Amino acid sequence: MSANYTLLAGAEEDLRDIIRYTRKHWGTAQTRSYVAKMQRGIEAMAAGQGLVRDMSALYPGLRMVKCEHHYIFCLPQNDAPALVVAIFHEKMNLMTRLADRLK
């Protein structure tokens, strides 16, 4: 976790699943590299940098960024760390899973 974002329980579980899957299929070195890229992507999005897409039409304040093969969704907060709500693979049914996560 970084000072500029907090992984909510669902996003933390998503990240653990990504780590397990990547380690199983591509090994430890690739896992470290991929997770480091994801962390940089999350930090940039939380700081309002990079190619962040405004998803407020779906949920107030929601932001999304694509990082490698995953979409990361977060809710920026005033004077508090951004809340990362989900990290979904590009082949998942993003909107259905996101709707479940934002309930």
Annotate each language-model stretch with its function.
Residues 75-103:
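Enriched for short, Lys/Arg-rich terminal
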Residues 46-47:
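Short proline/glycine- and basic residue-enriched helix-capping loop/turn segments at helix->loop/beta transitions
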